[in-house]
């Protein structure tokens, strides 16, 4: 009888160990799944211009120039556009604006959005846009994809002293020569802007994007703490 009890107890202990190991195995699987998701992020470097990039990558000057020129072209297409220089300067500051270059199909159209104004067709170069303040470049071995970055010197702008993209997404301090990790979606082409935006409209976009980024970061930290017990 005693021997039977010992056998039953041993069987129970093995079953209990298996039960306790199951959550551990699930947790390990979750970690590997998260690691797989992180591969969707991309490491990028921030530069002011092609010379800045070439100085940091002497053997890649051609790639630096190509990426810079690509970013300039993207900036011309995707930067916020303003009907007057004054509207642009109000958001980005003095010496931060330029006339938008002539572009195929760039004819302002009416929009129901509160951030845009219905503009009559204008002649080439009559709209204003912020100057490209820098650009974000992906790993050169991956083709050197790039995205233009803008910054504001207007004291009241949410983009003051920050690098933001054409959608208003914030990439931190407007300091070049640094490297950071961003979602791959940050390097995706942005839609061309064919409407003029009202004064303060882009600043609102930056504020909204920053709020969303803070909420996402808070949610991520909360989830991490929950997984950690």
From Swiss-Prot:
HAMAP family reported in the protein's UniProt record: UPF0441
Organism, scientific name: Yersinia enterocolitica serotype O:8 / biotype 1B (strain NCTC 13174 / 8081)
Spans annotated as Disordered: 101-125, 190-229
Sequence ranges of Low complexity compositional bias: 109-120, 214-229
Record-linked InterPro entries: Biofilm_formation_YgiB (IPR009576)
Sequence similarity: Belongs to the UPF0441 family.
Pfam (any one): DUF1190
NCBIfam families the record matches: PRK11653.1
Protein name: UPF0441 protein YE3666
